[in-house]
């Protein structure tokens, strides 16, 4: 199976998000890469569902709370940018202050 670099990046992100999801389900606090992966994967899935950029910018802030991540992580992630595929093309989605 031949994958483009972009497809490989998406698979890596999705795998990291699965690990983060499982750790969160076990009650572990997420670290920086896990938090970014989980939020990014959620945004990509919602974009695939047909949500708008504005909706994704808001929904991205609802994935995790301070209680879900290690101390200091919310301050390390002022925003997350995700290149998502929409029905009308690819767009850059920026989620400001994703962990409240």
Curated annotation (Swiss-Prot):
Its main location: cytoplasm. The keyword Cytoplasm applies. Pathway: Nitrogen metabolism; urea degradation; CO(2) and NH(3) from urea (urease route): step 1/1. GO terms for biological process: urea catabolic process. GO terms for cellular component: cytoplasm. It is found in: Cytoplasm. The keyword Cell cycle does not apply. Its EC number is 3.5.1.5. Keywords: Cytoplasm, Hydrolase. One of its GO terms (molecular function) is nickel cation binding. Coiled coil: none annotated. Pfam families: Urease_gamma (PF00547). It catalyses: urea + 2 H2O + H(+) = hydrogencarbonate + 2 NH4(+). It comes from the Bacteria. Heterotrimer of UreA (gamma), UreB (beta) and UreC (alpha) subunits. Three heterotrimers associate to form the active enzyme. NCBIfam families: PRK13241.1, urease_gam. PANTHER family: UREASE. Belongs to the urease gamma subunit family. This is Urease subunit gamma. It comes from Delftia acidovorans (strain DSM 14801 / SPH-1).
């Amino acid at each position: 199976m031949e994958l483009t670099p972009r497809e490989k990046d998406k698979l890596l992100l999705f795998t990291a998000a699965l690990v983060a999801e499982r750790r969160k389900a076990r009650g572990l606090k997420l670290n920086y890469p896990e938090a970014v992966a989980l939020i990014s994967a959620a945004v990509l899935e919602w974009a695939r569902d047909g949500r708008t950029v504005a909706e994704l910018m808001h929904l991205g802030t609802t994935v995790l709370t301070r209680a879900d991540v290690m101390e200091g992580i919310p301050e390390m992630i002022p925003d997350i940018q995700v290149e998502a595929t929409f029905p009308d093309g690819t767009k850059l989605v920026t989620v400001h202050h994703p962990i409240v």
